UniProtKB/Swiss-Prot annotation:
Pfam families: GatC. GO terms for biological process: glutaminyl-tRNAGln biosynthesis via transamidation; regulation of translational fidelity; translation. It comes from the Bacteria. Belongs to the GatC family. The lineage of its organism: Bacteria, Pseudomonadati, Thermodesulfobacteriota, Desulfovibrionia, Desulfovibrionales. This is Aspartyl/glutamyl-tRNA(Asn/Gln) amidotransferase subunit C. It catalyses: L-glutamyl-tRNA(Gln) + L-glutamine + ATP + H2O = L-glutaminyl-tRNA(Gln) + L-glutamate + ADP + phosphate + H(+); L-aspartyl-tRNA(Asn) + L-glutamine + ATP + H2O = L-asparaginyl-tRNA(Asn) + L-glutamate + ADP + phosphate + 2 H(+). Heterotrimer of A, B and C subunits. GO terms for molecular function: asparaginyl-tRNA synthase (glutamine-hydrolyzing) activity; ATP binding; glutaminyl-tRNA synthase (glutamine-hydrolyzing) activity. The gene is gatC.
Length: 94
């Protein structure tokens, strides 16, 4: 089922994209190509293929969960451009 311009406009709206009509046509064509490729991938026989979650075979060692000495509040706040002594002061955005 080909993707229509209306479908592409709906997806663009959901993604908060503003697209012109000519770009919507191109977007619809690209989405159609992606979905066609997904159908091709879905038709591949993978019955005898073992699932592969990562091509890397090494294991990630776990570190010991022990408390370590952390920086003090004063050391951390020393790097901030503005503080009130206990907290970072940041500019108001809204």
């Amino acid at each position: 089922m080909p993707i229509s311009s209306e479908d592409a406009a709906k997806v663009a709206k959901l993604a908060r994209l503003r697209l012109d009509d000519d770009k919507l046509e191109r977007f619809a064509g690209q989405m159609d190509g992606i979905l066609a490729y997904m159908e091709t991938l879905g038709s591949v026989d993978t019955a005898g293929v073992e699932p592969l979650y990562s091509p890397v075979t090494h294991e990630t060692p776990m570190r010991a969960d022990v408390a370590a000495k952390a920086c003090s509040r004063d050391q951390i706040l020393a790097n901030a451009p503005a503080t009130d002594g206990q907290f970072f002061i940041v500019p108001k955005i809204v």
